[in-house]
């Protein structure tokens, strides 16, 4: 509940209930019921309402000293705001040669908004090639379809110079089409045909005079977005990765609409003379069953050289003078207004002693490195973090407090932060994230092809943290019925706490979950018996945009359940649609598929 509610409640009580009390007991409160317009008296009443409102809020805050400390110790990522996300696309290289590797966490900037540049960083490592996607054709073939992508060199040179082994595709544009393409490429793909092209765009002929073509199996297309190095936001290593998949799905589903086409290194087996003649490539995806025959994908639906980006950047806070006169100190990012810059995490605190006496590193209280009873070499100064819902903007205010210690030296603290621009990126348009930084590779041009999402702070004023704490003891018995699964999924859907449209979409999505069953199964793996668990989930597709929407959601649930498996056991998921479709994934032991 917001502080405004407490303040208005106390002010109303003073002015309305106070008048009624004076009418009933005039001898006890002769002045409480008198109307007055003295501004000094009004100021006193408002100040009193402000103080008592804070007191009531403190009584109702559900022990943040316990829940916040526990979360900072175990899952500090859920105490951090959810920053803005978008998709960035790099333009093809203008020089021939191997791919240019754009590493994860490469910084980029937007054009200025109110003299503030929003700063982002990339989430996926991206290989940028001098290949351009110039044409996409889609044709119906019986019950199936054929998707053809034509790639051509964007500069002088030939395919043999590229050292091509993998190509990443982002399925973009209209959500229904992109999700159906995701389903088609990962579930209904019969095979892939690779056709080398000459400078005129015609198929190259082999030694026998017939056009060359290479056939690849459909399993060469693999999903993207589930690896540790493909996380949208930093997660501690001790947290359960399955919850990250859920949080990322509800916050930015576009993150999962990527696929990798592997096996392109087979081109290296061609004679050198043939490679020098190759100026392009045609990829034909034979889809055995298609649900998008009436909708035609275009070049807007398949993109190359894309990566999700997140609005996170390193920054310093204004220095703090540790004089012992305050219980806690508000962190203020330097050079920014609070509305345009919020604290995501505290990366380091350094205390500088006056008189050139050196410096000392402060450690988080939850690390226990400050306590001699935990076998640390020496006691070190420590700090604690506390977040509160801000009264001035939509984000959180972050405070630091320090242990009781000698403060006569009046240290000056420098604090390293990771920050966000809060909701300022919402004002960016398509193409506005196009400015390079110091660490951005040279000769690359880029732009955002989707609007930036909203930023959401964790709803600390509700029972959100206690729901998270209750999830620490979850197991498969906790997921014995579909209502329990829905509660877990709701917990990690942060946008639903703030956005009414997101809440409606979430209710529609979770309303499609009809039943869940678990069954213990045994199988032989490499000659050894192995115990596992099979989960059968029944979903009504009426609550989804289409079959592709259901499949993307089920794919995320498959990764979630696979990581939920007990030690030395495996998990397999089977999803049944009430309209008859059945999806089954390869049994998994954690991250390892059982083949």
Locate predicted features.
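Short, aromatic- and glycine-rich surface loops/edge beta-strands on solvent-exposed regions
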Residues: 106, 278-288, 412-418
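Mixed-charge (acidic/basic) macromolecular-recognition segments
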Residues: 1-23, 218, 223-264, 272-274, ...
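C-terminal domain/tail detector
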Residues: 348-595
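Extracellular ectodomain segments of secreted/surface proteins
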Residues: 34, 40-41, 48-59, 77, ...
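Short linear motifs embedded in intrinsically disordered, proline/glycine-rich low-complexity segments
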Residues: 9, 49-59, 65-78, 83-98, ...
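Aromatic sugar-binding surface patches on proteins
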Residues: 85, 251-263, 384-400
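Extended assembly-interface regions of large multimeric machines
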Residues: 1-200, 204-209, 213-216
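Short, low-complexity Pro/Thr/Gly
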Residues: 156-168, 172-373
